[in-house]
Swiss-Prot record:
The active site is at 322. Keywords: Acyltransferase, Alginate biosynthesis, Cell inner membrane, Cell membrane, Membrane, Transferase, Transmembrane, Transmembrane helix. Its EC number is 2.3.1.-. The lineage of its organism: Bacteria, Pseudomonadati, Pseudomonadota, Gammaproteobacteria, Pseudomonadales. This is Probable alginate O-acetylase AlgI. It comes from the Bacteria.
Length: 499
């Protein structure tokens, strides 16, 4: 089941919210767990057993680590067991096919018969719930959070359906207090509804309209320079609106039931370096990689060479996390290499006068990276790169022009206008001081995004805010249009579901 589907909007969500608010507070976590398992099993019920087994295993490992004591040798052994088992589960389901295919490519070149194995189906969301489980047992080992004895709360944390399929990558230590004591207010619910609609518009109205452009361009067997750059521009916008749209919807759903998740995007395309980009893009993953992988490898505590090695290795593994394909590994290496280069050149200390050039350069680096990220294989990636940097025919091919519509081109222009307007507003409103954190306090500032969702509602405002009222009306109208568009296409999967 996905958020952008009729069955979720018109059946699952209303039924769940009705039962949730009619239930006594002490039963709401259990109801949330049950609903999340139904949400997951809607895809394939046979993988629900694996999901539950991983959850129970890490709950038990957490108890063993907690009983052994913080950072003791016994706790370290339990932690090692937990991490190894988690990675083996992830490795088998996500990377076994890739490993066998890569091995077969090598041995067949020497005339050896290839291995024949049954294709292994990738369980949806496994990358997210395994990473969240690993972060929990590491936090227990480090003493950052106590081991919970409440299996229902822990299982609900791992399974909570707003973030289950494609993040954000949550941490138990950030949400444990909210599982025990969270408040439900009309203000918070209204904020959640606005945020959900905002994400829905991003996904259905913009990202889904851009998808055909990228698909057509990447499918061309002989793209022109114009085709290749159009495809890169379209996918760059599509991926942002698709993934940030999902994150907005997840955050909004969390607010509807009293949770406040961490922000996952902070206008990444205004970044002036790759380093800044990773402070703004997929923040929950980038901070996870920093806290649990980069620091564990040694971070910047060793020699200069070791620091650069740790940066590149972290991004290589981050690329591999996205998918079992050489394209993702190379994409990770691309970002890791530029992170190391920027650290060596002290890019953050560059003069302010060259900021526009830094922004253009950083955006081009990100977009070039998205090409291999989107490509189905290396052949497609090299074909796109060859067309992009041949700087030959800037016109679109006849096949591409025949498939493109005026509405698609208009949506692409609109997407970049939205990125520019809100990016500029964010740039001048406040400097980036670090990754946004999850906030449990009901008085926390409302999150920022394509539309600013005020924590107040019209019913309780002391004075009518005309711009805010106009924004809400626009959001409602666009949401209604997006629902009609969804009803026509019936199903709209998110790009990050494949990871």
């Amino acid at each position: 089941m996905v958020f952008s589907s009729n069955v979720f909007l018109f059946l699952f969500l209303p039924l769940f919210l009705g039962l949730y608010y009619l239930s006594p507070a002490r039963y709401r976590n259990l109801l949330l767990l049950t609903a999340s398992y139904v949400f997951y099993a809607w895809w394939r019920i046979d993988f629900l057993g694996l999901f539950a087994a991983v959850t129970v295993f890490n709950y038990w490992i957490g108890l063993r680590i907690g009983a052994a004591g913080v950072r003791t040798q016994s706790a370290q052994r339990w932690l090692t067991l937990g991490v190894v088992v988690d990675l083996c589960v992830l490795g088998y389901f996500k990377y076994a096919n890739f490993g066998v295919d890569s091995l077969n490519a090598i041995i067949t070149s020497f005339g050896v018969e290839p291995f024949v194995v049954t294709h292994i189906l990738l369980p949806i969301g496994i990358s997210f719930y395994v990473f969240e489980s690993i972060s929990y047992i590491i936090d227990v080992y480090r003493g950052d959070t106590p081991a919970t004895r409440n299996l229902v709360d822990f299982a609900a944390f791992v399974a909570i359906f707003p973030h289950l399929i494609a993040g954000p990558v949550l941490r138990f230590r950030d949400l444990v207090d909210q599982f025990n004591h969270r408040t439900h207010t009309l203000d918070k619910f209204a904020e959640g509804c606005t945020r959900f609609m905002q994400g829905f518009i991003k996904k259905v109205f913009i990202a889904d309209s851009l998808a055909p452009i990228a698909d057509h361009c990447f499918a061309l067997s002989d793209p022109t320079t114009g085709d290749a750059w159009l495809g890169a521009l379209a996918y760059t916008a599509q991926l942002y609106f698709d993934f940030s749209g999902y994150s907005d919807m997840a955050i909004g759903l969390g607010l509807m039931i009293g949770f406040r998740f961490m922000e996952n995007f902070n206008q990444p395309y205004i970044s002036q370096s790759i380093t800044e980009f990773w402070r703004r893009w997929h923040i929950s993953l980038s901070t996870w990689l920093r806290d649990y992988l980069y620091i564990s490898l040694g971070g910047n505590r060793g020699t200069t060479f070791q620091t650069y090695r740790n940066l590149i290795l972290t991004m290589l593994l981050g690329g591999l996390w996205h998918g079992a394909n050489w394209t993702f590994i190379i994409w990770g290496a691309w970002h890791g290499t530029w992170l190391a280069i920027e650290r060596a050149l002290r890019i953050d200390a560059a003069p302010k006068t060259i900021r526009p050039l830094r922004w253009v350069f950083a955006f081009l680096l990100v977009m070039v990276g998205w090409v291999i990220f989107r490509a189905e294989n290396l052949d497609v990636a090299w074909r796109m790169y060859a067309a992009m940097f041949s700087f030959g025919d800037w016109t679109l091919s006849d096949l591409n022009k025949a498939q493109l519509t005026s509405l698609q081109i208009a949506t692409l222009l609109l997407a970049y206008v939205v990125i520019a307007v809100y990016g500029i507003r964010q740039f001048y409103a406040q400097p980036l001081t670090g990754a946004p954190k999850a906030k449990a306090n009901d008085q926390a500032d409302a999150p920022q995004g394509i539309v600013h969702a005020s924590s107040g509602t019209l019913a309780y405002s002391q004075a009518i805010d005309i711009p805010a009222l106009a924004t809400r009306v626009a959001v409602l109208l666009l949401f209604a249009a997006s629902v009609l568009k969804l009803s026509a296409q019936s199903f709209s999967p998110f790009l990050y579901f494949q990871f």
